[in-house]
């Protein structure tokens, strides 16, 4: 067997072993302070993993209970679900409700928060979302991009970048009849104009 492959196997096992395990757990009544707040929501069955974090945690264990099985992840302050296991788990629980149990090590004490629910919709979500990436406030646009995100994983690609146009401001883009085959956006400033993107056969 390849030595590099073996090294990575032992590394992953070692990292998993380093994650603190809950002991002397105290149940609390306040909601789990997870970020982003994914508590009690409905999700499409093809959505990318809902990874989250608890700021200030020194250990974290999350168990998602489905209809017949469960999915467990642990770490320091982040819950990151393996995408392959996540996708197959959601497929098995399509149209059903899942319970999420969060236990976190805060200030030297393990705290068990009340469980919350993820309802898995029987419907899929459209695979892609496009958006304008700009600094908060909209007063400046030194770094401005139009980007496309695959909602079934974390793949992203740049549609347009104002670094390639002399730093011009780019207006929000729109699609014709919600079709990815036809879109447009306006470029302001010197040499500005409306950019039309049309897929041709």
Task: Give the positions of each predicted feature.
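Bacterial Sec-dependent N-terminal signal peptides
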Residues: 1-24
